[in-house]
A protein has these predicted regions:
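Structured aminoacyl-transfer and RNA-binding surfaces used for tRNA recognition/handling
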Residues: 1-183
Length: 183
């Protein structure tokens, strides 16, 4: 477990640490060698969001989960494992270790909007992995896989730099668990 880095990042373009990956940027960019062996890390990073791409200020106070200060949990692989293992382990953690009811779990998968010039391609790998997991759990993948756009499911570090599709898990916490994936 890697300790939270300072809220005042060593980065000229950031006022505050706004994401769990900030302290790992030099590793992602190949400027530093990964100090973790194997190439894995987990962290709980204190974050402040006060502007920029992931600005949550307009949502603070409008619901129960948007805050401008929070702790972001993260697990990171630096060439040690990839999407298949990450998705399988996330499912295992939620449903077998933490015992969340499987029927309340939904996964998002990146689906670009070509008319908006969204980058990259549909994340077929993540879709196929989630499809198999939900099917094996006796759940309808077409209900439990939700398509996300560039804003929600394409991770970018500024206008240039490391980027790519991401997949997120959401838990339906409504009393009747009847959102059917309407996140």
């Amino acid at each position: 477990m890697v300790s939270s880095s300072s809220l005042m990042p060593d980065a000229p373009n950031l006022l505050f640490t706004n994401a769990g990956m900030n302290q790992f940027v030099p590793i992602f960019l190949g400027q530093e060698k990964c100090p973790y062996q194997p190439g894995r890390a987990a962290d709980t990073q204190k974050c402040i969001r006060a502007g920029g791409k992931h600005n949550d200020l307009e949502d603070v106070g409008m619901d129960t989960y948007h805050h401008n200060f929070f702790e972001r949990l993260g697990n990171w692989s630096f060439g040690d494992y990839f999407k298949k293992e990450a998705i399988e382990w996330a499912w295992e953690l939620l449903t077998e270790v933490w015992k969340f009811p499987k029927e309340r779990v939904y996964a998002t998968v990146y689906k670009p909007d070509a008319s908006k010039g969204d980058p990259a391609e549909f994340d077929q790998d993540a879709y196929d992995l989630w499809f198999d997991i939900f099917k094996a759990a006796g759940l309808d993948p077409e209900v439990h896989i939700v398509y996300g756009n560039k804003k929600d499911n394409f991770w970018m570090m500024g206008d240039t730099g490391p980027c790519g599709p991401c997949s997120e898990l959401h838990i339906d916490l409504t009393p009747n668990a009847d959102t059917r994936g309407a996140l």
